[in-house]
Amino acid sequence: MAPSPSKRKERSEDKAKERGKEKAPGKEATDKDRGRDKAKKRRSASSGSSSSSRSRSSSSSSSSSGSSSGSSSGSSSSASSRSGSSSSSRSSSSSSSSGSPSPSRRRHDNRRRSRSKSKQPKRDEKERKRRSPSPRPTKVHIGRLTRNVTKDHILEIFSTYGKIKMIDMPVDRYHPHLSKGYAYVEFEAPEEAEKALKHMDGGQIDGQEITASAVLTPWPMRAMPRRFSPPRRMLPPPPMWRRSPPRMRRRSRSPRRRSPVRRRSRSPARRRHRSRSSSNSSR
């Protein structure tokens, strides 16, 4: 038998309910999943806020500690930067001085070099003078001679030691035929002068012991260049109002007036004398 329409409706309703029931758990599952996601998001948000607050507090504490440490580190960094800058400036100055010296230093260096160059020839001259041996003497001084000894006697005695170039025997002013007691003998070779010194120093001439000594030749004197002084400038005459007239003119123009000498009058004495004479005559 064919089912009735009412049964058909019931069956269709049941099927729809079953389908709805089947769909409901899927929806519930999706709703549950959505709720879980929302709860997770809320938890994550709450945990994020708490962590942010914690991080803020920690960041504030760390910032305070960081500021203190930053100040100390800043001071140390500033000190280090200063030291670094000073060291860098020193290194730069040293490098600049080693690389390219300043113009003032160049001038000082040039002056020192010029001074050292100018001093070198003087040193060379001194060293040459020290190194160069002194010339050997050829002149002999003979002292403590008696007045009886003449040039001929000295020539006869000292010619035995070599060729004599010159004999200088000063004479006394007041007694021209007598010597002053000493003489100079100049030989041609220094060896001859040394031989005469060896034999005649402490020897005897005319019964008296004499002395013989070498005369050192002086160094040739260099003629110093004369420095001509500039001519003196004549001072201009003083102005008229400053000129004072000479004293002679003053005296001639205004001679001194001598006050007349006061003389005592002799008239009262005469009167007295007359009065006395008259009194005597009356008596």
Curated annotation (Swiss-Prot):
Protein name stated in the entry: RNA-binding protein with serine-rich domain 1-B
Keyword Nucleus attributed: yes
Gene: rnps1-b
Domain RRM: 161-240
Chain intervals with Low complexity compositional bias: 45-103
Ranges of Basic and acidic residues composition bias in the record: 10-36
Superkingdom of origin: Eukaryota
Claim: DNA repair is one of the keywords in the record: no
Family: Belongs to the splicing factor SR family.
